[in-house]
């Protein structure tokens, strides 16, 4: 059987001669139409490739939201990321994993692709591994405090969340993701002045007053990463490297809202910004607010894979 091959340089043809009852039912009549469809398909595919290149910038601009769980393995997804092409991966695409921790037992985590190469070349040591930022669709199922008492002493790095809670989830996620979580360097708050005025607003006292470069595996999000701007962050020390909004929340702002546990009812979750001497920032039902550090909030961090 002979094959029909698309033209080397096809043109888009938007008109086709209709077959009628009197048209001879000869293979030539069918072949010419098949040829036109084949040429059009090749032309449109070439135009798509020309416009949407396989690069971080292009893929950060397209929201798709496809379930990749049964399409690619974690290793296959990370191969596409580490190659820097991000082929067939777009913002909003997701896959499910299962983790087990001493904090919450067994649970499902839906990992959403939130952006590509967002931290490329950042850090006191340049981060030059191609990566995808992952944000869980929902909080982990167990609530947590930032600190056992209503203080922000030591900033984010001094918190119970940073020192005790997140390392437990980091270990479980690293196991579930076949060690594909990438460490990168970020500026994190390490001190709080309890007497000065906070940028959060009139009458709010206490602000982040220092920072240090730290290795990061799993980390709470900043206000800018979620909202695109600061809302209640106490000072510029709260921003550091977290100074752009994740493409996920730019393209699908409804995903700021999360549930408690996989597909659970909506719940507020902690952000990393110090707000005052007693409170940290959090994301409520899409709005920015703050809560005393000993409040029980959701844990919805991000991490990079590749």
Regions found by a protein language model. Give the residues of each.
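Extracellular "spike/adhesin" assembly and maturation modules
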Residues: 1-49
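Collagenous Gly-X-Y triple-helix signature in extracellular proteins
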Residues: 53-306
């Amino acid at each position: 059987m002979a094959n029909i091959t698309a033209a080397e340089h096809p043109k888009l043809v938007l008109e086709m001669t209709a077959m009628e009852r009197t048209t001879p039912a000869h293979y030539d009549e069918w072949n010419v139409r098949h040829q036109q469809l084949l040429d059009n398909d090749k032309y449109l595919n070439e135009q798509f490739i020309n416009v949407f290149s396989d690069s971080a910038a292009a893929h950060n601009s397209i929201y798709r939201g496809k379930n990749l769980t049964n399409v690619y393995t974690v290793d296959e997804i990370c191969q596409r990321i580490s190659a820097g092409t991000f082929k067939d991966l777009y913002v909003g695409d997701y896959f499910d994993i299962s983790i087990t921790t001493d904090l919450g037992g067994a649970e499902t985590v839906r990992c959403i692709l939130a952006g590509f190469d967002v931290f490329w070349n950042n850090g006191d040591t340049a981060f030059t591994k191609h990566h995808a930022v992952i944000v869980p669709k929902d909080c982990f199922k167990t609530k947590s405090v930032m600190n056992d008492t209503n203080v922000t002493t030591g900033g984010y790095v001094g918190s119970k969340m940073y020192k005790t809670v997140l390392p437990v989830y980091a270990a479980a996620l690293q196991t579930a993701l076949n060690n594909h979580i990438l460490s990168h360097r970020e500026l994190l708050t390490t001190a709080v002045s309890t007497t000065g005025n906070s940028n959060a607003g009139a009458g709010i006292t206490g602000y982040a007053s220092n920072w240090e470069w730290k290795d990061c595996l799993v980390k709470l999000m900043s206000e800018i990463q979620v909202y695109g701007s600061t809302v209640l962050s106490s000072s510029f020390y709260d921003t550091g490297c977290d100074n752009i909004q994740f493409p996920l929340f730019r393209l699908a702002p409804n995903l700021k809202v999360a549930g408690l546990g996989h597909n659970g009812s909506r719940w507020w979750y902690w952000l990393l910004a110090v707000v005052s001497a007693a409170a940290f920032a959090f994301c409520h039902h899409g709005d920015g607010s703050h809560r005393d550090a000993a409040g029980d909030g959701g844990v919805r961090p991000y991490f990079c894979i590749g």
